[in-house]
UniProtKB/Swiss-Prot annotation:
Domain remark from Swiss-Prot or TrEMBL: Consists of three domains; the N-terminal catalytic domain, the editing domain and the C-terminal C-Ala domain. The editing domain removes incorrectly charged amino acids, while the C-Ala domain, along with tRNA(Ala), serves as a bridge to cooperatively bring together the editing and aminoacylation centers thus stimulating deacylation of misacylated tRNAs.
Residues reported in the UniProt entry to bind Zn(2+): 576, 580, 684, 688
EC number of this enzyme: 6.1.1.7
GO MF annotations, alphabetized: alanine-tRNA ligase activity; aminoacyl-tRNA deacylase activity; ATP binding; tRNA binding; zinc ion binding
Name this polypeptide is given: Alanine--tRNA ligase
InterPro entries: aa-tRNA-synth_II/BPL/LPL (IPR045864), Ala-tRNA-lgiase_IIc (IPR002318), Ala-tRNA-ligase_IIc_anticod-bd (IPR018162), Ala-tRNA-synth_IIc_core (IPR018165), Ala-tRNA-synth_IIc_N (IPR018164), Ala-tRNA_ligase (IPR050058), Ala_tRNA_ligase_euk/bac (IPR023033), DHHA1_dom (IPR003156)
Length: 891
């Protein structure tokens, strides 16, 4: 019997990568958790995801063998482990998948099986007597190989008939049998062999899956051999760690033990009993939250951001249940980075952002958590174990208090109460339908059908506009009113001159992408002249010219001359290069946690959205602006390089998480730093100036928040800076002339006006207060007597409500037996303020009068027994309000 070597999780990861590199594998770093250009997936959930294109076309892969350690998240869509996390030994939202792959090798199967078996038994010294394998029931070749490679007899090679041992990418496409390696944790753990009725007991745990993609499914009944085979393998790092560390439960490995120890320290609660589940959930969700934020996902109310918020709030609820009053999750970040930050450097780079967002979300959630829990307690107090909460209530908690369904489910689980999911889903569907009705546009179905048809045809356009401003092209498609047409004739165009789409085989017109707006210009030949008002890019390769015909007739297959508006393109290039320099300056001055969240490169301005936890001060914005202008004045070259993606990243190129890049990429470098690195180095398909001096000048217009942890910077460059400077100078001239001062003394003049205005406001407020405050003598002249009570009823306009409240309060304090009602009208909104003398509050209370008046008028309000107010819109009922109040006082 072999002695298994104890390795911590970081050592296992490194050992795995180095072992397979030694045997001819190229190391590929983990891709972002956000899949590049793959709308079918919320998050990367397996090692093969970043290599899907190579499975379909192995010949496009630069390397035949690859090894990775891939970050994965399963918390949304088909692969959703969120409910089970914390309550089982092996469910996680975030996990690491060790993998090695073969692309296009015909005879790699035996070699891969041999390498994997050697890694487990000779490199890690796992006891091979504890290993068994499964194979697809008809895969005799793999069973034979296991007998020869590992010396396994038939009792340890289990044949499985289900799809568990046959993998496919979908109804059609690459597919093939798989073989799985299981580790036997011993008879102290209940459970049977794979394929038996007791297989879920937990004794035998899958630690490696090897998929042999050797077929292609053409349709439901036809499967053929692949010309080029692939192999996809995956081993859960956390599961391997349990074996090497002699534990059964993933949460007992070194990584989780250290994270849970930090949670115990901060919460002052030991991880025992019910608290053990809370600690496990917090530790797991901390990893998922931090890595998602590091990969550019921000908490929000939809899409990936909502899944992140669900994960965060589930952990935060557990923190609340442990009795913690202050936010805790953000305090756990340093411990996580200490465990994983050396390998995943993005955690260190984004530490400030991760910390801010976790704290901000926990503070926000705490404000609604208590209200939501109060409603949940009220609605479930009469429910017993095994009963069901209404789905309508669960939806109200989601819609009003931000409780994700699984959070409510989690809270009720401890009382063995379920939720009517059907009712919840129905409420959700109704809300979604209402939302769709709000934005559903005319002809949207036609447009969708057209786009689907275009995608099927997939007509790629050759873009020649990097080097040419003019080019010849052949018209291959004309589309108007969401329909293909053979021609567009000016004589058949109505007065509106509807836009149409024109697609050519090649074009100098840049299609809107990467934040850069599309080109405008002219397309013409001897038969027609067409104005191009915009250019868009569909499916990443088809340039569509948005056009209006000016004269003549254009036909399919016509040869046309195409010329972009050079001045318009030049300004786009200026703004695009300025955006790159701005991005670099933001990273230099604010920190490397800066992630681009969006951009717009337009003719007249640029917009750049970045991840940053707080507002950027005016002083820092000035510093950033000065740095950008410094780079511009240096007049350094803006260089284009075509290079392998891995090489670009290794040299520090900035890439967008959401983008999917090919093996060869287009990189733009600007300037150099003292350590011979580029000042700005980004992967980019846009158009740029040749030298930074071509930009001219740069000016920041504004900075604002657009979401939690996301700031927007708007700016201008080039001639627009000169235009703005001229406008500002002319405006200063007009102001100086208006006030009969020089430009240099404008500010002191304005300060004097503000000071004088404040003094006049103060005097006006005092005058208005004096008009409202009443003495005994005034009361005698204007009050109505209702029994022993005196009623003063006044209508006023354009009074500061603070003055009115103060005057009413002081009057009723000084005069007994008085009810004072003042109706103030400001911009068609009425505020009714009611004061009652303290000596009569045993009979009449201001807040009770308010309730009666609201029943009559509508509106809303409240207050105390001596002072209350109502806000309402104007209504003719106000004309009879005094009579209503008199009747109320008389009863």
């Amino acid at each position: 019997m072999q002695m298994t070597t104890f390795l911590n999780i970081n050592q296992i990861r490194t050992t795995f990568i180095e072992f397979f590199k030694k045997y001819g594998h190229h190391y590929a770093s983990s891709s972002s958790l956000v899949p590049g250009n793959d709308p079918s997936l919320f998050f990367v959930n397996a090692g093969i995801v970043q290599f899907k294109d190579y499975v379909r076309a192995p010949e496009t892969s630069k390397y035949s063998r690859v090894v990775t350690c891939q970050k994965c998240v399963r918390a949304g869509g088909k692969h959703n482990d969120l409910e089970s996390v914390g309550y089982t030994a092996r469910h996680h939202t975030f996990f690491e998948m060790l993998g090695n792959f073969s692309f296009g090798e015909d005879n790699a199967k035996a070699d891969f099986m041999q390498l994997i078996w050697s890694f487990l038994t000779k490199e890690l010294f796992i006891d091979e007597d504890r290993l068994i394998v499964t194979v697809y029931h008809t895969d005799h070749e793999t069973a034979k190989l296991w007998r020869s490679i590992a010396g396994l007899d038939d009792s340890r090679i289990i044949r499985i008939k289900t799809d568990d041992n046959f993998w496919s990418m979908g109804p059609v496409g690459p597919c093939g049998p798989c073989t799985e390696i299981f580790y036997d944790h011993g008879d102290k753990i209940p459970g049977g062999l794979p394929g038996t009725k007791d297989e879920n007991g937990g004794r035998y745990v899958e630690i490696w899956n090897i998929v042999f993609m050797q077929y292609e499914q053409l349709n439901e009944s036809t499967r053929v051999e692949l010309a080029k085979r692939c192999i996809d393998t995956g081993a859960g790092l956390e599961r391997i760690a349990t074996v090497l560390q002699g534990v059964y439960d993933n949460y007992d490995i070194d990584l989780f033990k250290n994270l849970i120890a930090n949670i115990e320290h901060l919460t002052k609660i030991k991880s025992v009993g019910e608290a053990n589940f809370s600690h496990r959930i917090i530790a797991d969700h901390l990893r998922a939250s931090a890595f998602l934020i590091a990969d550019g996902v921000m908490p929000s109310n939809d899409g990936r951001g909502y899944v992140l918020r669900r994960i965060m709030r589930r952990a935060m609820n557990q923190i609340h249940q442990l009795g913690c009053k202050e936010p805790v999750m953000h305090q756990l970040v340093p411990g996580l980075i200490n465990e994983m930050g050396d390998f995943y450097k993005e955690l260190r780079i984004r530490q400030e952002l991760i910390t801010y967002l976790l704290r901000n979300e926990e503070e926000k959630f705490k404000t609604t958590l208590s209200k939501g829990l109060k409603l949940l307690e009220e609605e479930s107090k009469n429910l017993t174990s095994g009963s069901q909460l209404s789905g309508h209530i669960a939806f109200k908690l989601y819609d009003t208090y931000g409780f994700p369904f699984d959070l409510t489910q989690d809270i009720l689980k401890k009382r063995s109460i379920s939720i009517n999911k059907t009712e919840f889903d129905q409420n959700m569907l109704e809300q979604q339908n209402r939302a769709r009705q709000l934005w559903k546009g005319q002809g949207s179905n036609k447009e969708q059908l057209l786009l689907e048809k275009l995608k099927e045809e997939f007509r790629a356009t050759e873009f020649v506009g990097y080097s040419l401003y003019q080019a010849e092209g052949i018209v291959i498609s004309l589309i108007q009113d969401n329909q293909y047409v053979e021609y567009i004739d000016i004589n058949q165009v109505d007065d509106n001159n509807k836009e149409f789409w024109l697609i050519t085989n090649q074009t100098p017109f840049y299609g809107q992408s990467g934040g850069q707006m599309g080109d405008i210009g002219i397309i013409k030949n001897n038969e027609c002249t067409i104005h191009v008002t915009d250019t868009i890019k569909l499916f990443g390769c088809t340039h569509v010219h948005i056009c209006k015909i000016v004269s003549g007739k254009i036909n399919i297959n016509a040869v046309v001359h195409m010329a972009i508006d050079k001045q318009y393109r030049t300004q786009l290039q200026i703004h695009h290069s300025a955006t790159h320099i701005l991005h670099a300056a933001l990273r230099e001055i604010l920190g490397n946690h800066i992630i681009q969240k969006g951009s717009l490169v337009a003719y007249d301005y640029l917009r750049f959205d970045v991840s940053h936890p707080t507002s950027i001060s005016r002083e820092i914005l000035t510093k950033i602006e000065n740095r950008v202008n410094e780079i511009i004045l240096n007049n350094t070259a803006v260089k284009l390089m075509i290079m392998p993606f891995d090489q670009a990243i290794a040299h520090g190129a900035v890439a967008l998480f959401e983008e999917k890049y090919g093996d060869e990429v287009r990189a733009i470098s600007i300037g150099e730093t003292s350590d011979a690195r580029y000042y700005s180095f980004e992967l980019c398909g846009g158009t740029h100036v040749k030298y930074t001096g071509d930009i001219g000048a740069f000016r920041i217009l504004s900075e604002s928040a657009i979401a939690a942890g996301v700031r927007r910077v708007e700016a201008i460059a080039g001639k627009h800076v000169i235009k703005q400077a001229r406008r500002n100078s002319e405006l200063l001239d007009l102001i100086a002339e208006k006030f009969s001062v020089t430009k240099q003394t404008i500010m002191s003049k304005i300060d004097g006006i503000i000071e004088e205005n404040n003094l006049l406001k103060k005097q006006l407020h005092q005058l208005k207060y004096n008009q409202l405050i009443l003495c005994e003598k005034d009361i005698q002249n204007i009050a109505d007597d209702i029994g022993t009570i005196k009623l003063v009823y006044k209508n006023i306009e354009d009074y500061d409500l603070q003055i009115v409240r103060k005057a009413v309060s002081n009057t009723t304090k000084n005069i007994k037996n008085l009810v004072m009602v003042v109706i103030s009208n400001n911009d068609k909104k009425n505020t009714i303020i009611i004061g009652v003398s303290d000596n009569i509050t045993n009979k009449i209370q201001a807040n009770n009068l308010v309730k009666e008046i609201i029943n009559y008028l509508g509106g809303s309000g409240g207050g105390s027994a001596t002072l209350a107010q109502i806000g309402c819109q104007y209504t003719c009922k106000l004309l009879d309000l005094k009579n209503i109040i008199c009747k109320l006082l008389a009863t």
